Amino acid sequence: MKFQVDRDILAEAVAWTARALPSRPSVPVLAGIRMEVGDALNVSSFDYEVSAEASLPVTTDEPGTLLVSGRLLAEITRSLPDRPVDMSLEGSKAVLTCGNATFTLLTMPTEDYPTLPEMPPSTGSVGTDIFAAAVAQVAVAAGRDDTLPVLTGVRVEIDGDTITLASTDRYRLAVRELRWNPSRPDVNAAALIPARTLADTARSLTSGAEVSIALGLPGQPGADSATGEGMIGFEGGGRRTTTRLLDGEFPKFRSLLPDEFNAVAELPTAAFTESVKRVSLVAERSTPVRLSFSEGQVVLEAGTGDEAQAVETLDASFDGDDIQIAFNPQYLLDGLTAIDSDTTRISFTIPAKPAVITGKPAGDDPAQPDYRYLLMPIRLAG
């Protein structure tokens, strides 16, 4: 086996593939990156949960396959000079040469490496930038408690040309709808995807114009052929990744979103975000930021008489009876930074019920905003 490849292309592919390497592999070969040379160089990794594979152009007259330490290969390729990279298999060792630098790496038996799962049939495609932004908006609200695995996922619902993404950790709920290009106009499916894996995948597949989404539900065509478990795959820009779906029943989130409100505030997103950041500097762990809305303004407060305190007043448009409400400052900031509008709209029912944070629709558009962030308030003393 012998090949030559561009240094930057190789380094990017290896770094991307190494993301899927397990931190504590159950068997040594899972710490490896597999390199297979044929018409192209395929660089892959797999930990039985997530697979990653990148295809890149290569010059070769000796095809073959090798398996080397993934993290070591990533560190080496990242530090190489800007020269073509030559790599060959010599007995049980891989020799990598770039400029005047030569590295000799121990290989692992490729026959012990698991077979990568096949990509399910494509369900449709969506623009990479749109998809990455939508996933980032929603993944922020996913739970991080592995004892509640259902809440660590993002619910993906496909209905024709619309995808709905939703996540919740019980304290907030993020929902985003976006248009896409389905493979069939009548496609209808739902899946629960690990949030961290989905967010990482969406961020890393932006090199192409579109990302193809391939969903294989349990017991249906496209499921993992080895286990029968549900699986989803993403492909774009010469890169492919798959992950197993989470089991469990996601909360019926649509019933949590109110249709009618008693008060609505509108504020400049950037100024409001900065105000929350400043005021929350004095908020100790789990201490809320208090918001008092009245005609023409909102007063932000944090801290108590026995601690450091902060107060700031910000101009705001407000329609409804005066309201005082308190939020976890980090959860509030997570929602505000996900808003892609210059103006933030906060809609209230009563102070004890969740508020809904959205961007202000352009003009007088009455349509439902494509992103909604529902945030539970913290009960105020007294």
Short names for language-model regions:
Residues 1-382:
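Structural preference for solvent-exposed beta-strand-turn elements
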